[in-house]
UniProtKB/Swiss-Prot annotation:
It is a multi-pass membrane protein. This is Teichoic acid D-alanyltransferase. Pfam families: MBOAT. The keyword Nucleotidyltransferase does not apply. It is found in: Cell membrane. Coiled coil: none annotated. The chain crosses the membrane at residues 7-26, 31-46, 51-76, 80-104, 121-137, 180-223, 225-256, 309-328, 334-351, 365-387. Residues 27-30, 77-79, 138-145, 176-179, 257-266, 304-308, 352-364 are cytoplasmic. Changing H328A: Abolished D-alanylation of lipoteichoic acid (LTA). The gene is dltB. Residues 146-175, 267-303 dip into the membrane without crossing it. GO terms for molecular function: acyltransferase activity.
Amino acid sequence: MTPYSSFLFFILLGILLLPTIILGLNGKRFQAYNMFISIIILALIFSHDLHGVIALCLFTIWQVLLISGYLAYRQKANSGFVFCGAVIASILPLFLSKIWPFLSHPQPHHPPHNLISFLGISYLTFKGVQLIMEARDGLLKEQLPLHRLLYFILFFPTISSGPIDRYRRFVKDEQKAWTKEEYADLLYTGIHKIFIGFLYKFIIGYAINTYFIMNLPAITHNKILGNLLYMYGYSMYLFFDFAGYTMFAVGVSYIMGIKSPENFNKPFISKNIKDFWNRWHMSLSFWFRDYVFMRFVFWMTKKKWIKNRMAVSNIGYFLLFMLMGVWHGLAPQYIIYGLYHAVLMTCYNFFEKWNKKYKWLPSNRWTTILAIVITFHFVCFGFYIFSGKPFHHHH
């Protein structure tokens, strides 16, 4: 059962969350109950997928051993090699799940069963890597209580597609004793978000896909216009589908007393590509910014291998977006999508510097509108690449 994809899922979820809501509105602690229903809901999600359950359990044991082991090691020593080893070991299951389809030679009609992969592996990997990095930075000092670590890794509302939370932020919410009034606020916000999610995913997103994208052959026979309309349609569909999905995840988290981070902030009114990545899939881009880009820039500055700061940040962007592309998958569209955004970020970097120097583009209402329109088209073209449509040859 895929999370948030059927009304049955919401009905079961509603029934299971009732005790949480009653406890919360009476100002009582509900985290132990939440941990209990998390197990039930994970069992529901994976009910038809025994491979998935086994993979999830093995993956979780692997990550917990790695994190606990590295934390224990970090209290005594701090070698860069051990740190890199731990990070690589943490990413290994995800890496294997990505290359698995290429390793096993499938018959064209029977895709091989990916034994390593399971729903949510890409998002859970972020949690493991993040904990190891925070231990390295000395932000996590003592061993993490097992139940709390497991609850963080396996927190079901965000398991399949994020948003990506941070351990210390999560635990602060998890340990907090919400008052009746605070919980009533959380509950209201959560339900509100869930209804916006219904609007986005099941009404707007569904309508765009069913009545626009599916009907494109009937709307126009012109190939160029057809592709252009597909680009706009797909970009809108992607946003409403994914933002709706995120609304569900965040809404359910709020009802469970966890304020999961937001993922979208009006991405289509971004004034430039940097602004776009601060508004689109924010928990993902901030994760890459903090754990890949900043580390890389810091490391380069410390080692003084490349003196030019502009070059360092541009190489950092290529590293970040190539990783982000590969993280989505190894199909050509994802890798080209990553490259495309790296090039855009680099060009914008140069433009920004140049514009600061020569004041070529004045800042007023019209240039802002122009900037939004230009950014929007660059972004949509990126999604057009991402959709894989340019790579499908029609017979």
